[in-house]
Amino acid sequence: MPLLTVNNLKVERGGISVLEIPLFSLNEGETLAILGPNGAGKTTFLLTLARLLGYIQGKLFFKGEDISLPERTVPYRRRLAMVFQEPLLLNTTVFNNVAAGLKIRRMKKKEIEKRISKYAELVNIRHLLNRDARKLSGGEAQRTNLARAFATEPELILLDEPFANLDAPSCDSLIDDLYRILRQTETTAILATHNRLEALRLADRLAVMDAGKIVQMGASNEVMNYPVNEVVASFVGMEAVFSGCVQTVCGGSFVASVAGHAIMALGDVKAGEKVICCIRPENIIISRDSAMEGTSVRNNLPAKIVKIIPRGPFFKIDLDCGFFLASYVTQQSLENLSLMEGKDVTVSFKATAVHVIRREKRC
């Protein structure tokens, strides 16, 4: 039995639908990441699941129990915890902040101290327990927020962009610790984020939201590599998304015409059919000549470098092949290939690197 199930959920604001979830289920012990741009409905969905936001239609079930009924709202809320982007700490010590939820539950002093000791250790804030919460760094404050949530030992924890305001080192460290804590405590979690790297590091499954709807949900690898439409493809990192017309089909492979180029890919398509092709930047190889010809790489195209953009330890290379492509290279590759804006190069990618979305329309 799923831990949480949603049926025909609908939320409106000012008479306008902002959230429509026909069917949703969450398994006990799993971590689900909800990806989507700002305004996609991620926070609205979490607030609705927490019963902190009303809805005009639908049913929510927690362990098979209908929690849509008003009299079950408070008991249900006590079984979950929610962590927001802002820590919202009380004007007191870290110890008292972590103890807040336990005191509301009227736990005994010894049990409170035991819980705080356990979760302060897990979240690495034991040395901060006597500190004034107002003097914490952003990372320390969010760790305190997480300790407060986990100390109640919730059956479900909802995480709404918890890393959004942190610097990169604090974010990386906290994500690693959160992954460890979720696995160690076997707590079921839903993470709302617009950062696909955070989602991949933490989640067993991914859901992608757009305009208040879940447009795709599945195993992380499935969603990342097999998006169902252009919106999902762009959001999960397939920066090159372009349309083509299938010319010839042979077995499980085909050749599509794209801006005058013949692109080989794999897929169950028909000649004359329109398709959307998606390629990840890491699957695009740049060379100064046709060096990849004669290898297993089937697609070799002339291209011009349009823009070079620093991306941490890598550089993103925007390319014009008559259609847009992008690639990532290291500093060493950038120098070895003498890459610069305006330079003509050859781009290569395997037929297996192309993810195909069928349009089921004729060219």
Regions of interest found by a model, annotated:
Residues 50:
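Helix-to-loop junction immediately C-terminal to a conserved catalytic motif
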Residues 260-308, 328-363:
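Glycine/charge-rich catalytic "coupling/switch" loops of P-loop NTPases
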Residues 35-37:
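The feature captures the beta-strand-to-loop junction immediately N-terminal to the Walker
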Residues 132-136, 140:
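Conserved ABC ATPase signature
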Residues 66-81, 104, 227:
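ABC ATPase NBD coupling module
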